[in-house]
Amino acid sequence: PRLIDHRFPDDPNSKLNVCVNNLLTKYREYDSVKGTQIVFCDLYRNAVNKVELFNAWDEIKRKLIVGGIPANEIAVISDYNTDKQKSDLFEKVNSGEVRVVIGSTMRLGTGVNIQERLAVAHHIDCPFRPADMTQRDGRIVRQGNSIAEVEILRYGIEQTLDAGMYAI
């Protein structure tokens, strides 16, 4: 609801908050191997008169920092604009220096090779094209991943567009 109107209350059972809680749990669970996590969220901001009122990516990062993850271990892809910046980020994700990366299918899908320690993929929303979900999952389910068993978590709400998109 806060994407529609930032004045809505912060529901502790929202998809965003459930995802944040899972991110914090999995961060600790995979700490010994520096396991990394990717968060896909295509519907992430509301802009009115070019003034952002709510940005889901920034909110996730803020809550992860409050939850104890150091800020330098969390990356929001929109902060990395040049090829060099992205390449450096992806190296840090592969080394486990950056443990959580947040972004969209377009920015973190096709051509992104960050699989070396990728333990968990979080899908806060479902892309409109099935091929995009395949690309998202392809970031984690691939050769070169040192994590033998990975987790893919999809977040949805019954009787909403989520349910229809996930065909549940």
Q: How should these model regions be labeled?
A:
Residues 1-4, 42-47, 81-82, 107-109, ...:
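Short, solvent-exposed loop/turn segments at secondary-structure junctions
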Residues 1-69:
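Conserved helicase/translocase motor-coupling segment
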Residues 76-78, 123, 154:
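Structural signal for conserved beta-strand scaffold positions within catalytic alpha/beta enzyme cores
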